[in-house]
């Protein structure tokens, strides 16, 4: 999600370095970043932050990390975390391909990919967050029993992701081509999810593991 540039964004984030990190200095210190040692779930591409903040509030027994490379967008998530005093949520402004520089092998229990950029042009396929290059990153940081939960309104990206994950050897389950047709009570909608669902787009979802 692109927002108007805020020249003061980095200074704002630095003032809240107890919950947000804008560099790669957290390697080997992720566990110490939280108040309690608990399973860690991450969302790659947190956008405006509704999903990750609501998940953290609903599941205090889990530590959450929202990953959003756009510092201007990250401001919104920090504001929500501070205003609502969400203690089991931390935030990182890094690119997804650098996750192995942040997390140790097997350190993460679940990865959420919600409404990622579909990068529709074939020449941009390697930028899709379900491309095999990213799957290798996820495989490294996920626990052996860890899972990826993926949601998108983009049918082409969903089909591509199924093919990419299957070709990589991943096991897929709970494939849903119309999530909102019989929406689970525990489904937390992102801002994008509401937007596209209201426009009549079907929401696709799946779970996968290595």
UniProtKB/Swiss-Prot annotation:
Biological or metabolic pathway of the protein: tRNA modification; N(7)-methylguanine-tRNA biosynthesis
Top-tier EC class: transferase
EC number: 2.1.1.33
Pfam family, one: Methyltransf_4
Origin superkingdom: Bacteria
InterPro entries, alphabetized: SAM-dependent_MTases_sf (IPR029063), tRNA_(Gua-N-7)_MeTrfase_Trmb (IPR003358), tRNA_methyltr_TrmB_bact (IPR055361)
GO molecular-function terms, A-Z: tRNA (guanine(46)-N7)-methyltransferase activity
Active site: 117
GO CC annotations, alphabetized: tRNA methyltransferase complex
Binding sites annotated in the UniProt record for substrate: 121, 153, 190-193
Catalyses which reaction(s): guanosine(46) in tRNA + S-adenosyl-L-methionine = N(7)-methylguanosine(46) in tRNA + S-adenosyl-L-homocysteine
Binding-site residues, S-adenosyl-L-methionine: 43, 68, 95, 117
Stretch forming the signal peptide: none
Gene3D superfamilies: Vaccinia Virus protein VP39
Function: Catalyzes the formation of N(7)-methylguanine at position 46 (m7G46) in tRNA.
Family according to the record: Belongs to the class I-like SAM-binding methyltransferase superfamily. TrmB family.
NCBIfam families attached to this UniProt entry: PRK00121.2-2 (NF001080), tRNA (guanosine(46)-N7)-methyltransferase TrmB (TIGR00091)
Name of the protein described by the UniProt record: tRNA (guanine-N(7)-)-methyltransferase
Organism the protein comes from: Macrococcus caseolyticus (strain JCSC5402) (Macrococcoides caseolyticum)
Origin organism lineage: Bacteria, Bacillati, Bacillota, Bacilli, Bacillales
Encoding gene (name): trmB
């Amino acid at each position: 999600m692109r927002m108007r540039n805020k020249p003061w964004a980095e200074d704002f984030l630095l003032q809240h370095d107890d919950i947000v990190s804008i560099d790669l200095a957290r390697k080997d210190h992720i566990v110490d970043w939280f108040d309690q040692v608990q399973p860690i779930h991450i969302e790659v591409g947190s956008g405006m932050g509704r999903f990750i903040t609501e998940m953290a509030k609903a599941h205090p027994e889990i530590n959450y990390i929202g990953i959003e490379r756009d510092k201007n967008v990250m401001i919104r998530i920090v504001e929500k975390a501070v205003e609502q005093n969400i203690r089991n949520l931390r935030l990182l402004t890094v690119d997804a391909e650098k996750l192995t520089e942040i997390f140790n092998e097997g350190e993460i229990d679940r990865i959420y990919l919600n409404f990622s950029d579909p990068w529709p042009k074939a020449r941009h396929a390697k930028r899709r967050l379900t491309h095999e290059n990213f799957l290798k990153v996820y495989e490294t940081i996920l626990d052996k029993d860890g899972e990826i939960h993926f949601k998108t309104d983009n049918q082409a990206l969903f089909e591509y992701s199924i093919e990419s994950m299957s070709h990589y050897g991943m096991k897929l389950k709970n494939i849903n081509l119309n999530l909102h047709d019989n929406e689970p009570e525990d489904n937390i909608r992102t801002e994008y999810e509401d937007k596209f669902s209201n426009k009549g787009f079907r929401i696709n979802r799946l779970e996968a593991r290595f």
